[in-house]
Design a protein with these regions (language model features):
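Short, surface-exposed amphipathic charged segments that create phosphate/polyanion-binding patches used
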Residues: 59-62, 112-115, 164-171
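Nucleotide-state-sensitive switch-loop elements of NTP-binding domains
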Residues: 3-97, 104, 108
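A short acidic, often aromatic-flanked loop/helix-cap motif at beta-alpha or helix-coil junctions
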Residues: 51-57, 107, 137, 160-167
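Residue-level signal for alpha-helical context at structural boundaries
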Residues: 23-25, 116, 160, 164
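Unusually extended, aromatic-enriched hydrophobic runs near protein termini
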Residues: 1, 121-124, 169-171
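Phosphate/Mg2+-binding loops and adjacent switch elements
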Residues: 73-157
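Long, charged, low-complexity intrinsically disordered regions
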Residues: 151-171
Length: 171
């Protein structure tokens, strides 16, 4: 999911070449970051266990200690985006892009049980990636749901192997 996406982004020379990267992971995921990749891409990983740790003082300490030129926040959506939006960022820090990753195999369940939380996440996204998509994924329906919330977002469907799912869009 998110961790794999971040690792693929870091592995891209266009993104991380010559930069001092900082990844702030706001939850332990299923997948772990590869130490070799972190070293190769000049990336420091900081993992937080609790929302209370993610605050303005923490961000200021990260700026002072690591002096990053690029920051990726692997955010825990359960904390709510307003929490992040309202936080004072260190000088030079800004949100360049909001990317939301969605597990296509569990999207229906999330939508039924946590619709408002998910829609809040999607409304500010520049890019929404449905990963773990298959030929059975109702991609046109999912894309229509996302367009209703955020017509400006780019919506893509990615298969397990990283290739994009091709599908017919409904009119």
């Amino acid at each position: 999911g998110k961790t794999r996406f971040v690792q693929e982004t870091l592995a891209d020379d266009y993104f991380s070449g010559g930069e001092r990267n900082l990844v702030i992971a706001c939850e332990e995921g299923v997948e772990e970051y590869e130490d070799e990749l972190l070293q190769k891409t000049n990336t420091t990983l900081v993992v937080l266990e609790d929302k209370s740790e993610f605050n303005e003082m923490f961000l200021a300490e990260c700026q002072k200690k690591y002096k990053p030129t690029q920051i990726i926040v692997e955010y825990n959506c359960m904390w709510g985006l307003d929490y992040l939006r309202e936080m004072y960022m260190p000088k030079g820090w800004f949100v360049a892009q909001v990317i939301t990753t969605v597990d296509a195999t569990t999207f229906d369940v999330y939508l039924k049980n946590m619709k408002s939380l998910f829609m809040e996440m999607a409304k500010d996204s520049d890019l929404i990636i449905f990963n773990r998509s298959t030929d059975e994924t109702p991609a046109a329906t999912y894309k229509r749901n996302m367009r209703a919330v955020n017509p400006k977002a780019q919506v893509v469907f990615e298969k397990e192997d990283g290739s994009q799912l091709e599908f017919e869009e409904e009119m």
